[in-house]
UniProtKB/Swiss-Prot annotation:
It is an enzyme of class 1 (oxidoreductase). Its EC number is 1.2.1.70. The keyword rRNA-binding does not apply. This is Glutamyl-tRNA reductase.
């Protein structure tokens, strides 16, 4: 079985492409079934395995398969599933085999490959991806082991390095940008659209600035109300957004919608109602919640996750010592995992040896039982049984020794000597 990771992320593709390749949560299970069965070879000797990790910054397919053409098949499947021409998608896709796939998984879970260096959200997202793949019946021995090792490595990296300290989060970056637009965030009305983890983080940072008003709009009114109450804010129905958008100076949106929920026309009307007072908008969703054309409006300052990345990277540069320490830990753990993977390659051979040996044993036992039933001397039957088993079990190694010559023969002799610890060396003439 070969490990393979196929994907795109914020390093290789802009948000405009990433949002087209993202998988909504409810689509992942059926997508896994299709991907695993159609493109990883349901007739393969070993059952193929797969998992899909889809976040704001990456969409990745983790595979374990015998199919040597899995790389091309995975890219083609991703292209067909999302209806994106292969020629458009392929230049942005990375394919990481074996140790590269292992190293990548360890780095992702440890926060080393994130836009926010050392952030912890990705670890939870990866665990969710594993849970979904397990529920879909898409995981097996190889990926299960990979992900369990991945989570252990992430825990070790975060526990023994300072990779997560003093990081500038996306939420903190959003506040910094708002402070560039408005002299005082405390004088502004802030609207949060959504009620997930990212919105909760943003609300925490903005609430610390003491805004004039904090409002949460969410599809599920009860969840939005709970979040608003945590920050002494209030909730409003999401359906009221088009008619009330003009009330807010700062709008932060991050929902799971597959289509934009804020269109150009609605924002144009809001700007007009505000008499062209500026609106600061942050779209943290992938796919995007706000139509990108909104960013062209004169009085609107629209930022996406990619835009916030520049501010985040400023804070990343100061922690390169922690990065080097984390990379060293990961490299050691990659080598350990590859050693385990190498041992797995002999499992089919060992299983076959057991099957063959057991077949020989059963055949000889059956023969012995017939002789005993016939009344033959038990001692003679046992002697014949043991002699037959001995001859048949050493027949393979003996034949191999007689077939090979030269260096191959010497290597095989050394190998056999290891099997049979008391075998005399070839230069021992004592006959013992």
């Amino acid at each position: 079985m070969q490990l393979l990771t196929i994907g795109i992320n914020h390093h290789t593709a802009p948000v405009a492409l990433r949002e087209r390749v993202a998988f909504p949560l409810e689509q992942i299970k059926p997508a896994l079934v299709t991907f695993k069965n159609v493109f990883l070879g349901p007739q393969a000797p070993n059952t193929p395995e797969a998992a899909i990790l889809s976040t704001c910054n990456r969409t990745e397919l983790y595979c374990a398969t015998d199919d040597r053409a899995a790389r091309e098949g995975a890219v083609r499947w991703l292209s067909e599933y999302h209806r994106i021409p292969v020629d458009e998608l392929a230049p942005h896709v990375y394919a990481l085999p074996q140790s590269e796939a292992v190293r990548h998984a360890f780095r992702v879970a440890s926060g080393l490959d994130s836009m926010v260096l050392g952030e912890t959200q990705i670890l939870g997202q990866m665990k969710d991806a594993v849970r979904t793949a397990t529920e879909a019946g898409a995981l097996g021995t190889y990926l299960n082991q990979l992900f369990q090792r991945t989570f252990a490595v992430a825990k070790e990296v975060r526990g023994t390095t300072e990779i997560g300290t003093q990081s500038v989060s996306m939420a903190a970056a959003a506040v910094r940008l708002a402070q560039r637009i408005f002299e005082k965030v405390s004088d502004q009305r802030v609207l949060f659209i959504g009620a997930g983890e990212m919105i909760e983080l943003c609300a925490t940072h903005f609430a610390a600035q003491g805004p004039r008003e904090l409002v949460v709009a969410n599809r599920t009114a009860e969840r939005g109300q709970r979040l608003a109450e945590r920050f002494n804010g209030r909730a409003m129905p999401l359906a009221d957004l088009p008619t009330r958008m003009h009330e807010f100076d700062i709008i932060v949106s991050c929902t799971a919608s597959t289509l934009p929920i804020i269109g150009l026309g609605a924002v144009e009307r809001a700007v007009k109602a505000r008499r062209h007072r500026p609106i600061f908008m942050v779209d943290l969703a992938v796919p995007r919640d706000i139509e990108p054309e909104v960013g062209k409006l004169k009085d609107v300052f629209l930022y996406t996750v990619d835009d916030l990345g520049a501010i985040v990277r400023e804070g990343n540069a100061s922690r390169q010592a922690a990065v080097a320490q984390a990379e060293a830990i990961i490299e050691t753990r990659v080598q350990n995992f590859m050693q385990w993977l190498d041992t797995r390659s002999v499992v089919p051979v060992i299983r076959h040896m057991h099957t063959q040996a057991d077949a020989l044993r059963r055949a000889e036992v059956e023969k012995a039982q017939k002789l005993l039933a016939r009344g033959d001397d038990p001692a003679a039957v046992l002697e014949a049984l043991s002699q037959a088993l001995t001859n048949k079990l050493i027949h393979g190694p003996t034949s191999a020794l007689n077939r090979v010559n030269g260096a191959d023969r010497d290597s095989l002799i050394d190998l056999m000597r290891g099997f049979y610890q008391h075998a005399p060396r070839s230069n021992d003439q004592s006959g013992h």
